[in-house]
Design a protein with these regions (language model features):
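Periplasmic alpha-helical coiled-coil/stalk elements that build and connect Gram-negative outer-membrane
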Residues: 1-2, 56, 146-261, 371, ...
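Bacterial Sec-dependent N-terminal signal peptides
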Residues: 1-31, 41, 425, 431, ...
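Bacterial Sec-pathway N-terminal export signals of envelope proteins
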Residues: 22-74, 80, 234, 240-278, ...
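Small/polar, glycine/serine/threonine/aspartate-rich low-complexity segments that form flexible
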Residues: 24-25, 72-113, 243-251, 295-328
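Amphipathic alpha-helical coiled-coil segments and their boundaries
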Residues: 33, 40, 47, 117, ...
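Sec/SRP-type N-terminal targeting helices
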Residues: 45-49, 62, 119-146, 196, ...
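Short segments within alpha-helical structural elements
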Residues: 210-232, 387-444
């Protein structure tokens, strides 16, 4: 028995780190959620890695302009020396005959250092000029990725805030119906209401509770989606601290009304793409001009009939040379011209894409502005309408309580109130989404 208890305690202690980790709680404003995502979202992480990859690629290009130094060494054992036929008369022999002579030694060793230095290569120098733009190109991609994640977090975060408001309205309606049911039962007990009136209220209560259950489930799923966007463990708990008001929906939009293409990160990105295409054209043009390089080597060579290279006193012979290499392209079968033309066509494609993006941006800004204006107007109307529906419901309820109103009237007022609340919730969500889309379209998000 003691062993069983000890085993349970061991299991509990083993699970404590897991339980603790599962109960991590994060209270987050919208900005804190965005900052968390910038550090933990996988897409942002990979975009940042692309910047580092480009930095290493730039180092590789830079390295080609530095001296290239290498050491080499070899050792050869000549198992069979080559034999040459030499006229015998060279050695006092019979004219017209030949002697077989083996030339060489059994062992050869060579060691040395080689240096190559690029002095001028237009293609390499163009690559060096493009390094900064290439880094900025990848950094701009990081900004675009962050902006996309930021926009999605805006929408999901405020969707959850709006859903909380929706849940509060459902709870308020449940309280109203419970009180109305209680009052109706009292009236029924006193003979002023029918059992059917109570049954109708029970149906409405069941429907509202079902709606609440669905809303709670949707909110839970929304939190899961927010965690995925932020790169947060699913087991962690998130508590949203920001609220939503009409003033927040209007705040910052006036500044966004002043718009410039250069404020859009995707427009900046495609501009950099055009510049990189220009570097391509320049690089291929440079392939038609001469290249100049310097090479040098210094070697030591030794020859032995016995393997005694490491003994002192043996002779080693120095070999050294310096070479200036000039390569002048004369004819490449029109391949260079074809590469230049292809690069120019690709650059024109990028320019065309930039012009197409301008049209797309114009459309996005105008549509987003129209949607925002309409959404804010609808929000104002629906807020007033919800207040009016609440007033109508309260007045109808009072009439019902004093016996001058019917159950049909109060059911209608309840239905109208619920419809007005639903319309307000939808208008509130549509307004904040329209604001996010407008800020993103104008490059102000």
């Amino acid at each position: 028995m003691k062993g069983s208890k000890r085993g349970r305690w061991i299991l509990i202690l083993a699970l404590l780190p897991v339980i603790s980790m599962a109960q991590t709680r994060h209270e987050m404003s919208l900005q804190q959620a965005i900052d968390y995502a910038r550090k933990n979202n996988v897409q942002v992480k990979n975009a940042l890695l692309d910047v580092q990859i480009q930095q290493q690629t730039n180092r590789e290009v830079t390295g080609s302009a530095y001296p290239q130094i290498s050491a080499n060494g070899s050792m050869t054992y000549n198992a069979k020396l080559p034999v040459s036929l030499v006229p015998a008369e060279f050695f006092g022999g019979t004219p017209g005959t030949f002697e077989e002579l083996a030339f060489g030694v059994k062992w050869n060793a060579t060691g040395g250092v080689t240096l190559n230095q690029l002095l001028f290569d237009g293609q390499v120098f163009t690559g060096l000029q493009a390094r900064k733009t290439l880094i900025e190109f990848q950094q701009k991609n990081v900004e675009i990725t962050e902006e996309t994640i930021r926009a999605n977090i805006y929408k999901v975060y405020y969707q959850l805030v709006v859903s909380k408001t929706q849940l509060d309205l459902i709870d308020a309606n449940l309280d109203r119906l419970e009180k109305l049911k209680k009052d109706t039962r009292i009236m029924y007990d006193n003979g002023f209401a029918e059992k059917l009136d109570i049954d109708k209220l029970d149906v409405q209560l069941v429907n509202l509770n079902t709606e609440k259950t669905n809303a709670v489930n949707q909110i839970g799923n929304g939190y899961l989606g927010l965690k995925v966007l932020m790169g947060m463990p699913i087991s962690d708990e998130v508590v949203l601290t920001d609220t939503l008001s009409n003033e927040m929906i209007r705040d910052g939009v006036l500044d966004a009304s002043q718009f410039d293409y250069a404020q859009r990160r995707d427009f900046q990105y495609i501009n950099m793409g055009v510049r990189l295409r220009e570097y391509d054209v320049q690089r291929y043009k440079m392939s038609k001009i001469p290249t100049l390089s310097l090479s040098a080597y210094y070697n030591k060579n030794a020859q032995r009939n016995e393997f005694d290279f490491f003994k002192s006193g043996g002779s080693w012979f120095d070999i050294s040379a310096i070479t200036l290499n000039l390569n002048i392209p004369i004819f490449t079968g029109f391949a260079a011209n074809a590469r230049i033309s292809k690069a120019r066509l690709s650059m024109q494609q990028s320019i065309n894409q930039r012009e197409a993006l301008k049209l797309q941006i114009d459309n996005e800004v105008q549509v987003a502005r129209n949607n925002y204006t309409t959404a804010v107007s609808n929000l104002d109307y629906q807020k007033k309408n919800m207040g009016l529906a609440e007033l109508v419901y309260e007045q109808t309820k009072k009439k019902f309580e004093v016996g001058t109103g019917s159950q049909t009237e109060i059911n209608t007022a309840q239905t109208d109130l619920k419809s007005a609340q639903t319309n307000y919730i939808n208008a509130l969500y549509n307004a904040i989404i329209a604001k996010v889309d407008f800020l993103k379209a104008t490059g102000k998000l």
